Amino acid sequence: MNTLRFPAGLYGVTPEWDDTSRLLAAVRDAAAGGMRALQLRRKHLSREQRLLQARALAPLCRELGVTFIVNDDWRTALEAGADGAHIGRDDATLAEVRAAAPGLLLGVSCYADLNRARELLAQGADYIAFGAVFPSPTKPQAAHAPLALLGEAAAQVRACGEPRPAVVAIGGITPANAGLVAAAGADSIAVITGLFEAPDIRAAAQACAAPFPLTD
C-alpha cells in the first residue's frame, strides 16, 4: 500500500498572469492532460488581487478534481475555499498555520535541506518540496537540490506511516526531464514554465504526468 496525503504526478504552479480568463482556460487544458494539483503563486500581487484569482480558481479546481493550493498565504487559502497552502521559509511556521487552519493541506519548502524536511515532517507536513532540481527560469539564483536528495527524502516519508507525506520536486522541470525526477524518488513535480508556457499545454501536461503512476 502506498497512499499519499497529496496527489502524485503533475502539480502545476501558476505563471505571473494577470489575465484570469486566460489562466482559467490554461488550467482546464492542464487538467485535461493529467494535472492533479495546482498552486496559485502570485508573488507580486496585493492580497486583495490574489484573493480574487484564488476565488476564481477554487471552484474550477473543484469541478476538475484538482487539489488547489495557495502559495505563501494561508488566510487567502481559507477565504477562497482552497484545499491547502504552501509555506516557505519566511512565512508563518507550520505549527502556527496548523493550529489556525486545521483543515488545510500544508506543503513546505525544504530547498536542499533534509534536516529541515525531517523537522517539518515531525510537525505534520503533508508534502515536502525540494528544489531547484534543475536550473530554474523562475528562480535563477535558487540553490541546487541534487536528484539523489529525492531518494533520501523518499526514505524519510516512508517512515511516516499511511497515508504518508509526498515528496515534491521543483525547479526547471519539463516534459523532457520529468522521468528522471520520478525515477529519483519524487511523488510529484511542480512545474511552471514547462507547463503553462508550452505551445500545447494539454500535451505538456500529459508528458509531465506520464512517468507517475496514480497510486494515491
Swiss-Prot record:
Catalytic reaction annotation: 2-[(2R,5Z)-2-carboxy-4-methylthiazol-5(2H)-ylidene]ethyl phosphate + 4-amino-2-methyl-5-(diphosphooxymethyl)pyrimidine + 2 H(+) = thiamine phosphate + CO2 + diphosphate; 2-(2-carboxy-4-methylthiazol-5-yl)ethyl phosphate + 4-amino-2-methyl-5-(diphosphooxymethyl)pyrimidine + 2 H(+) = thiamine phosphate + CO2 + diphosphate; 4-methyl-5-(2-phosphooxyethyl)-thiazole + 4-amino-2-methyl-5-(diphosphooxymethyl)pyrimidine + H(+) = thiamine phosphate + diphosphate
Signal peptide (from-to): none
InterPro entries: Aldolase_TIM, ThiamineP_synth_sf, ThiamineP_synth_TenI, TMP_synthase
This enzyme's EC code(s): 2.5.1.3
This protein's pathway: Cofactor biosynthesis; thiamine diphosphate biosynthesis; thiamine phosphate from 4-amino-2-methyl-5-diphosphomethylpyrimidine and 4-methyl-5-(2-phosphoethyl)-thiazole: step 1/1
Record SUPFAM superfamilies: Thiamin phosphate synthase
Any one GO CC term of the record: cytoplasm
Cofactor note: Binds 1 Mg(2+) ion per subunit.
Binding site for 2-[(2R,5Z)-2-carboxy-4-methylthiazol-5(2H)-ylidene]ethyl phosphate: 136-138, 172, 192-193
Function: Condenses 4-methyl-5-(beta-hydroxyethyl)thiazole monophosphate (THZ-P) and 2-methyl-4-amino-5-hydroxymethyl pyrimidine pyrophosphate (HMP-PP) to form thiamine monophosphate (TMP).
Protein name: Thiamine-phosphate synthase
Organism: Bordetella avium (strain 197N)
Organism lineage: Bacteria, Pseudomonadati, Pseudomonadota, Betaproteobacteria, Burkholderiales
Gene assigned in the entry: thiE
